């Protein structure tokens, strides 16, 4: 999948990603009014406004950018309708040839991590049928619970030819409380970065 992202970057000449992190209060009033007229001031109405706003952004930019990054929490706050809007956004972006990076920052272990991986970049079996629930191309993963939180995602990536962005050093103001802690003279995030690099080299190509 990284090859597709690189190809898109070369094609557009734009090593950037457009974040789709919608906040209802910033969505243009005419979009909100139309959505609320159809669905009322409900979760469904909010989700429809988000979806229409995203669609307009994508329609205006899809031939200029290589990828988009929807932040799932902005959709989850509107419950099931919000997740429907997230899925519609993912599908629409992919139909326009964009690489979709699901900004989900999952970090758990064992079967829970496996379920996250399957739900977002893998396939799930339901009886005799198979489904790709959210079907992003990449997802973001938090590695600070250890390798048993990341390995299930790696396994699914191998199977489905998907990709990961693994957090190493984050930009939030309090990140240094843990990430900058010194271990044998080196900050923790450097050790995490080395581990991620090792995994990446093993999966390269």
Language-model regions: role of each:
Residues 1-60:
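N-terminal glycine-rich anion-binding loop in soluble enzyme alpha/beta folds
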Residues 2, 54-58, 86-90, 150, ...:
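Generic structural signal for well-ordered alpha-helices
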Residues 16, 100-102, 164:
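Hydrophobic beta-strand scaffold residues
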Residues 18, 68, 103, 139:
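Conserved, mostly hydrophobic/aromatic
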Residues 46, 70-82:
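Glycine-rich, proline-tolerant flexible connector loops at the mouths of alpha/beta enzymes
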Residues 58-65, 92-95, 154-160:
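Acidic (Asp/Glu)-rich catalytic clusters
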Residues 87-108:
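Catalytic PLP-binding core of fold-type I/II PLP enzymes
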Residues 108-205:
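Conserved anion-binding
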């Amino acid at each position: 999948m990284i090859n597709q992202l690189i190809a898109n970057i070369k094609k557009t000449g734009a090593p950037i990603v457009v974040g789709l992190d919608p906040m209802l209060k910033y969505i243009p009033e005419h979009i909100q009014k139309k959505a609320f007229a159809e669905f009322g001031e409900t979760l469904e109405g909010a989700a429809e406004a988000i979806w229409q706003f995203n669609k307009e952004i994508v329609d205006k930019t899809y031939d200029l950018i290589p990828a988009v990054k929807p932040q799932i929490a902005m959709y989850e706050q509107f419950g099931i309708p919000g997740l429907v809007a997230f899925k519609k956004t993912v599908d629409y972006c992919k139909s326009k040839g964009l690489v979709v990076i699901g900004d989900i920052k999952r970090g758990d272990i064992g079967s829970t991590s496996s379920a996250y991986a399957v739900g977002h970049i893998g396939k799930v079996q339901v009886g005799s049928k198979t489904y790709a629930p959210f079907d992003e191309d990449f997802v973001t993963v938090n590695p600070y619970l250890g390798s048993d939180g990341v390995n299930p995602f790696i396994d699914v990536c191998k199977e489905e030819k998907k990709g990961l962005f693994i957090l190493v050093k984050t930009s939030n103001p309090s990140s240094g409380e843990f990430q900058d802690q010194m271990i044998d003279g080196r900050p923790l995030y450097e050790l995490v970065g080395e581990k991620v690099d090792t995994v990446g080299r093993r999966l390269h190509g």
